[in-house]
C-alpha cells in the first residue's frame, strides 16, 4: 500500500491521475481511479466496489482523498488483508494518520510519500522549461557572483517572483 500525503493544493490529485495515465493502459482495465469525495460512497464502504473490481481482474486501486471515506483507515486495512495481491495507492492530507486517530496497522503496511510545494527554483524550472540546478549554502556564499552570471542570461527571476508568492508553491491547484 502506498500513501501520497500532502497539504491541500499541493497536487495529490494531479499526481495520481498522471500516475494512472503513465503506467496503466485504460483498455486493459487493470487500474481503477476513484475519488472518495463522491456521493457514491455516502453510507457505503469500499468492500463491494473492490470485490467487483478484483473479480474483473483489477490489479491496482487508486483512491484519491481516501480520508473522505467513513472509517477510511480501517477500510484500507480490511482491503489489504482481504485482497493481498491488490496494489492500493491512496492520497490523504498530511495531518491524517497522525496523533490520537492513528491506525498503527495502516502505518505498518503503508509506505508514505509526502508531496511538498515547489521551491522558487522548481517553480522557475516548471514555468520556463529550464533545468536550473541546486546549490549548497557554502556554494552560494562563496560563488554567488558566478552563479548569478550563469542564471541571469537564461531567466530574470524577479519577473516570476510575485507569481510564485501568489500561486507558485502550490502550482497545480490553479490548473
Where are these predicted regions, by residue range?
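Sensor-1/coupling segment of RecA-like P-loop NTPase cores
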Residues: 81-103
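Hydrophobic anchor at the beta1->P-loop junction of P-loop NTPases
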Residues: 4
